[in-house]
Amino acid sequence: MHRYCRVGFRDEHRISHLTASTMAKKHRDDFVMTIDSDSEASDGGDSDTEQKTGDLNPDFVFGEAEETAFTGWDLDQKDVANHKDVDLDGILRSKGGLSGMIDGEEEEQKEEEEENEDNAEDEEEVNAGEDDEDLAMDGFGMGAEQEDDEEEENSEQENEHEAESEDEQEQEISENDEDSAAAIAEFYEESKTTEKITSFQALQLSRPLLKGVGNLGYTVPSAIQAASIPIAMMGKDIVAGAVTGSGKTAAYLIPIIERLIYKPAAVSATRVIVLTPTRELAIQVCDVGKKLGQFVANLNFGLAVGGLNLRQQEQQLKSRPDIVVATPGRLIDHIRNSPSFSIENLEVLVMDEADRMLEEGFQVELTEILELIPKHKRQTMLFSATMNTKIQDLIQLSLDKPVRIMVNPPKQAASKLVQEFVRIRKREHLKPALLYHLLRLVDPQQQNRIVVFVSRKEMAHRLRIVLGLLGMKVSELHGSLTQEQRLQSVKDFRSLAVPVLICTDLAARGLDIPKIEIVINFDMPKTHEIYLHRVGRTARAGREGRSITFVGESNQDRSIVKDAIKSLEEQKNGKAVSRTVDWKKVEELNSIVESKKDTIDEVLEEEKSAKEILQAEMQLEKASNIMKHEKEIHSRPKRTWFQSEQEKKQAQRTPVMQSLTKHGKKVNSKKRKAHEERKEEKRSYKKTKSDRSAPKTKAKSKKRK
């Protein structure tokens, strides 16, 4: 009997190992390569050959079947960074870049260090109390796994749509969309004096939630939190706005988690959906929610964003998490194509950055989501840094007698922000050299986080190459990057591995990147509202910060500066100064930049060739796998969308664009806006030749009489 048990034990061990090995091999064989995926690992031989010994392994212990729960996309994991991308830094090093300062900078740096010693001591005093946890940035510690074969086409379409929408947003923004002070005053009621809430205990929150709030270092509710949390806990619809960095994310997550503490434990269902305009903001919101509810039993979060693994998201949504944080496109995809995902029991709908959600790029998706969501009674909350008061937009969102909350007057920058302006005049060609000069001047050791905003993705990429060739560590963040590249850029920026981040307005909305010391506006934004969002990345949560803006000679640039100064005068806080620049030094640096033009072109060409080689390898491997698993791939149901390609293009084309593009030519934003203005204006009557000659004939007839 004893011998029989021993043999059975050994055979069971061998069988279990063979089964696991076979399943792993089958999983590898079932994998179809995509452009954004890793290369397949080669099989190193059958693992069962190692188990052919007849001896019993004394260290073998039976364990329970492990189920890996989703714990966030942790970019710090080593096994995530296997994605093949073009090594741009390697190309720059081969061209002599990223090696330090250019010739002649060493001596000047010593002088600058002596001048900046006093400033460094002041900064140490300011930063002494900044040991707080980087809460929201942990949301970027999210590992991005590669997409499988089914989602490749959808992901490419999402990336193209996002890149197009980013370009469209740069073109479509006009000052006519801004509300006047009278319209805002009419929309929001006059403020009434209420009791000031001095602690989260006064909000009557549950103990598990209070423990999570305390662990995050929250002690006193911010103004938006104190105003909105009690109303949200009453179940009323909310339209709320506050300045950036005021804690809007926690303002809606805290009442939601408090509500879910009392949910029916027997039934698992998705009860809350949080919509965000960008993937990065969705990842951040999901991570903040997990930390707030870490001590709440049976509280689950789901993430549904484009660019990340579709199959993993489907498996996660299959468990019906309580709160799903999503971007509009991927949410519609899951509702239509994931049979196990249901929103029948939805109770709360949140739209973060609501004004941007209502812009043209998200209008169609929002309408479709509102049609897909059940019509039963639900709570809807809109949170944003700015709140557009267009009545038709609020009606479309189907709000039921919403409570309107506006904390802090709109169009105000942080009180501890120093706004500096550099007048470019007719020196547009010197801007790259000026940027390098200022970066070396304000942070010679590259120990502070600096965000540089540009208007175009192409300029962001070119500046990264230029500054890299001049010896600076720089990363980029914009819509043309893959999701893995975006997350890696922010992770490097967070850890100060790369202290300078060049980005478009993609990162200007909602993202809480902590401890950013300086914001530089390389290109002036389109409106004062976008300017506030950009400079709002620094001087957050009561810290000091500085913004440096390059101002051109256009009327638009000047009006934004006037609005910023006017806002400071009304606010009676903050500071605005004109920064003097040593233009002779900038011109010397520009001559160095000009001398590297051929090198820049070589880097761009080499990068393009490397990308083509990588894509060819991926396509070759993908074709090979498709031939092996053709039947299985074609047997899977095709994913559907609520719009055809023709309907998408038609929805994006406004009547003005249709009239301007009759012959298939693309029109830039200036021509389109000029056409709109001409169409809106009443046509003035212009005298014809006969009209001008009529008075003369009348005068002659009078003389004859």
UniProtKB/Swiss-Prot annotation:
An MF annotation (GO) of this entry: ATP binding
Residue positions binding ATP: 242-249
Motif DEAD box per record, residues: 352-355
Ranges spanned by the short sequence motif Q motif, renumbered to the chain: 198-226
Polar residues bias locations: 652-661
Basic and acidic residues: bias regions: 674-694
Gene Ontology terms describing biological process: ribosomal large subunit assembly; rRNA processing
Coiled coil: 97-178
SS bonds (residue pairs): none
Biased composition (Acidic residues): 37-48, 103-136, 145-178
Matching SMART domains: DEXDc, HELICc
Cell compartments where the protein resides: Nucleus, Nucleolus
Transmembrane regions listed in the UniProt entry: none
Keywords recorded for this protein, A-Z: ATP-binding, Coiled coil, Helicase, Hydrolase, Nucleotide-binding, Nucleus, Ribosome biogenesis, RNA-binding
Enzyme class: hydrolase
Catalytic activity of the protein: ATP + H2O = ADP + phosphate + H(+)
UniProt-listed Enzyme Commission number(s): 3.6.4.13
Domain Helicase ATP-binding, chain residue ranges per copy: 229-405
Subunit-level organization: Associates with pre-ribosomal particles.
Free-text domain note: The Q motif is unique to and characteristic of the DEAD box family of RNA helicases and controls ATP binding and hydrolysis.
Function: ATP-binding RNA helicase involved in ribosome assembly.
Protein name in the entry: ATP-dependent RNA helicase DRS1
Lineage of the organism: Eukaryota, Fungi, Dikarya, Ascomycota, Saccharomycotina
